[in-house]
């Protein structure tokens, strides 16, 4: 019997900001569209994007992503002056922008891009997280917990094969 493919395909991840999940504790995540130029889309298709030093700020009621490096391709950007660190406007609804603005201004939250992925094969989306920075002891606790999970899985696997 042949399985039917689900109508919702898993989004294809382009880039992930691993440092963000280590340095921040996210309380809420949301999806935002990106306003991009043609050469940026071509570079993203080739995987020439880096989210590691990236953050989101709000200005004049709009959200912008700063620090996202998109390296231009030599073949795709011959007639356009390319700025790899250009500000990218995030496409969010007014309700989402107002919610973000309230939390950032009043409660000291940060907005950090977590990952970039393709939605429906043609749209580049960014998963942004709303959270606060972790303290050093929180980072150590997370590292210990992660190491314990790995060790526990190793012991369970060993028990399963030998016992």
Swiss-Prot record:
UniProt KW keywords: Cytoplasm, RNA-binding
Subcellular location: Cytoplasm
Record flagged with keyword RNA-binding: yes
An MF annotation (GO) of this entry: RNA binding
Entries under Pfam families matching the protein: SmpB
Protein origin, superkingdom: Bacteria
SUPFAM superfamilies according to UniProt: Small protein B (SmpB) (SSF74982)
Database matches in InterPro entries: SmpB, SsrA-bd_prot, SsrA-bd_prot_CS
Key word Phosphoprotein present: no
One of the GO BP terms on file: trans-translation
Gene Ontology CC terms: cytosol
Family: Belongs to the SmpB family.
Matches recorded under NCBIfam families: PRK05422.1, smpB
Chain's role: Required for rescue of stalled ribosomes mediated by trans-translation. Binds to transfer-messenger RNA (tmRNA), required for stable association of tmRNA with ribosomes. tmRNA and SmpB together mimic tRNA shape, replacing the anticodon stem-loop with SmpB. tmRNA is encoded by the ssrA gene; the 2 termini fold to resemble tRNA(Ala) and it encodes a 'tag peptide', a short internal open reading frame. During trans-translation Ala-aminoacylated tmRNA acts like a tRNA, entering the A-site of stalled ribosomes, displacing the stalled mRNA.
Record PANTHER family: SSRA-BINDING PROTEIN, TMRNA-BINDING COMPONENT OF TRANS-TRANSLATION TAGGING COMPLEX
Protein's recorded name: SsrA-binding protein
